Amino acid sequence: MSIKAEEISSLIKQQLEHYDDKLDIEEVGVVTYVGDGIARAHGLNNVLSSELLQFDNGAYGIAQNLESNDVGIIILGKFDDIREGDRVKRTGRIMEVPVGDALIGRVVNPLGQPVDGLGEIKTDKTRPIESKAPGVMQRQSVNQPLQTGIKAIDALVPIGRGQRELVIGDRKTGKTSLAIDTILNQKGQDVICIYVSIGQKESTVRAQVETLKKLGAMDYTIVVEAGPSEPAPMLYIAPYSGIAMGEEFMYAGKDVLVVFDDLSKQAVAYRELSLLLRRPPGREAYPGDVFYLHSRLLERSAKLSKELGGGSLTALPVIQTEAGDISAYIPTNVISITDGQIFLQSDMFFSGTRPAIDAGASVSRVGGAAQIPAMKKVAGTLRTDLASYRELESFAQFGSDLDQATQAKLARGRRTVEVLKQPLHKPVAVEKQVVLLYALTHGFMDAVPVDDIARFEQELYTDFDANHADLLAEIKSTGKLPDENKLQEALQQFASSFSSSNK
């Protein structure tokens, strides 16, 4: 068999024509240490801060510490099968999560993967978890109310769309219930809600998801869950994932509410990671940049300018205090970042005043501008009246010889406290709140025994729904009080027909 030189040369020419000289260059490092959700790798000389890295087993990590000899990496997910000597490669991108309408109604983990057993989430849109907050000129002032349906908040510490309002209090004082009720009240308000659960018991989260489903709130809600059994990196990135999902809707011109429940546990997870990465500890062993941890998150909450679509992202961060100490490190940090705080007191909670909002310590720095005129008018003096009642109440314990005016103030104060109580998962529409508070401040409840106030409230709503729906509709559509003569006449008719249980 003779081999012809022409055939060989033509075959070589064919091979050269089809030769593809594209090379895939990967920068690969070697794992030198792994444990507690942390890995160290040698050889990643050009890696960028916060860059996403991939391990041999498919797990991802984020580059945190860039040192002269190695890189400190936080591992996202399980790290049991990562070994010393495994390879880790750069991806050239930062951590992203899936976003968009496909996530609404779903329960996902901080990586955007479904954990509700309802199948995969079909979306091709992603967003980086870290992004720059809108600048001063990209925002507008908060001017639209976000109704929580909770009388004590909408009247005393109103929240505007685009605001950051801290919910702070000891454990078991109703912080989560308050946030869930706010989500429930957004039904029909064209607000998309994102509930980020950080380190909450999985049984508790399950119960909350069932409540949201039962009351129809999952139709406009995304739940991001990082359970206590998850590694610390998952608890650390959960709030950033949640706000990235919200930003997608905000930049599309929609209104979004994001609840972070709670950021104390995220700070603890970040402290754990920082200590494992050998970063120097500071006050309460937190690292020096723990303020930046929360400020860069909450600054992404905004009311965008009209040029950018006018969307808004309202943040309700939750912080847990120890024995009511709001002067601890993390509480003071977050108080200074946010636009106000709602302080829940355990003494009030256990005495039966629920929601246990301490009107004296709670404040809303920008929400007042967003309050509807009708509510501003009826609730104007409510805070000072309540504060003077608390003061008088402590003096009244020492003697019974009180003048008529003081007794009247005490009687009005008791009724005010009773009016601001509210059962769980029963948000009240703002127009009904206005009518109720008008009745309180104009003396229509002065003759009603304190024990009958709750019944008076329910019967008042029923009466107005049946006989004065036009007045409620006017408050709802205009945001202003209707003709006061008509309103007073309607309240007078109802008050005279109301029978107290003492009779």
UniProtKB/Swiss-Prot annotation:
GO terms for molecular function: ADP binding; ATP binding; proton-transporting ATP synthase activity, rotational mechanism. ATP binds at residues 169-176. Its EC number is 7.1.2.2. Pfam families: ATP-synt_ab (PF00006), ATP-synt_ab_C (PF00306), ATP-synt_ab_N (PF02874). It is found in: Cell membrane. Keywords: ATP synthesis, ATP-binding, Cell membrane, CF(1), Hydrogen ion transport, Ion transport, Membrane, Nucleotide-binding, Translocase, Transport. It catalyses: ATP + H2O + 4 H(+)(in) = ADP + phosphate + 5 H(+)(out). Its main location: membrane. One of its GO terms (cellular component) is plasma membrane. It is a peripheral membrane protein. It comes from the Bacteria. The record marks 362 as: Required for activity. Produces ATP from ADP in the presence of a proton gradient across the membrane. The alpha chain is a regulatory subunit. Belongs to the ATPase alpha/beta chains family. PANTHER family: ATP SYNTHASE SUBUNIT ALPHA, MITOCHONDRIAL. F-type ATPases have 2 components, CF(1) - the catalytic core - and CF(0) - the membrane proton channel. CF(1) has five subunits: alpha(3), beta(3), gamma(1), delta(1), epsilon(1). CF(0) has three main subunits: a(1), b(2) and c(9-12). The alpha and beta chains form an alternating ring which encloses part of the gamma chain. CF(1) is attached to CF(0) by a central stalk formed by the gamma and epsilon chains, while a peripheral stalk is formed by the delta and b chains. This is ATP synthase subunit alpha. It comes from Lactobacillus delbrueckii subsp. bulgaricus (strain ATCC 11842 / DSM 20081 / BCRC 10696 / JCM 1002 / NBRC 13953 / NCIMB 11778 / NCTC 12712 / WDCM 00102 / Lb 14). The lineage of its organism: Bacteria, Bacillati, Bacillota, Bacilli, Lactobacillales. The gene is atpA.
